[in-house]
Swiss-Prot record:
PROSITE patterns: FE2OG_OXY. It is an enzyme of class 1 (oxidoreductase). Residues 167-267 form the Fe2OG dioxygenase domain. Disruption phenotype: No visible phenotype under normal growth conditions. Keywords: Iron, Metal-binding, Oxidoreductase. Belongs to the iron/ascorbate-dependent oxidoreductase family. This is Flavonol synthase 3. Catalyzes the formation of flavonols from dihydroflavonols. Possesses low activity in vitro towards dihydrokaempferol and dihydroquercetin producing kaempferol and quercitin, respectively. It catalyses: a (2R,3R)-dihydroflavonol + 2-oxoglutarate + O2 = a flavonol + succinate + CO2 + H2O. Its EC number is 1.14.20.6. GO terms for molecular function: flavonol synthase activity; metal ion binding.
Amino acid sequence: MEMEKNQHISSLDIPVIDLSNPDEELVASAVVKASQEWGIFQVVNHGIPTELILRLLQVGMEFFELPETEKEAVAKPEDSLDIEGYRTKYQKDLEGRNAWVDHLFHRIWPPSRVNHKFWPKNPPEYIEVNEEYASHIKKLSEKIMEWLSEGLGLRHEALKEGLGGETIEYLMKINYYPPCPDPELVVGAPDHTDVNGITLLVANEALGLQAFKDNQWIDAEYTTSGIIVIIGDQFLRMSNGKYKSVEHRAKMDKEKTRISWPVFVESSLDQVFGPLPELITGDENVPKFKPYVYKDYKFRKLKKLLLD
């Protein structure tokens, strides 16, 4: 099975959905279909200005090009149990290959959870650009959540409310993958599914994201102005299995620096989530997953403990 899983093809393309199509019903249907069959898709003409995305990429790259001492000004404290801050992460994937990536985590919404201590002061535009991007990405994510809720036959607020409503958190992560002379020995990010509800990601021109479908790894082709949307575990479980939490990974590039900006849309740690009650309607629609407090689910998944 492992040999099969390591097979790689590029003949399939992840779905690309044009949000400027005036037929919103058609757009919503495409989003639902992609979430059911793939768990990953790209949206284009999504309303977030291309100039803003390019500025986001620029200030992020400038931060990671700073001397290490400057980056350490926003480092994750050694004794912190939270995730926010800058750090260099080393780990091995299931095949024993080294995985390394420098990264920076900080929340961008809601305001009550934003800690500017972990937002770089250099480059000077960093805070302004990220605040502007946060307002746009929140609006886009809420629209996608509405379509996904309606795709379940529910009120358009259902998934947002199930995730926590106004307490939903938006966690920005910047992944910085330096060039690697031998990508076969190193991976950028090991195979995984996201624990959260939905992830919205932009990246620079160095491709490297792969998704697992039909027992094959597929290169995710994308443009720097497009947004990659990834369905996570919370929406898999809240939809009672109707939406797919896609397994994905990041590979290294021999010559180019790859950098990506996922925003994880997730519950607060104390939020209870599970199959939405409206979907559990009788013997044919029994719950497929146990409900969890989000922090307990994250802990059990991290420790590879039994979940259901």
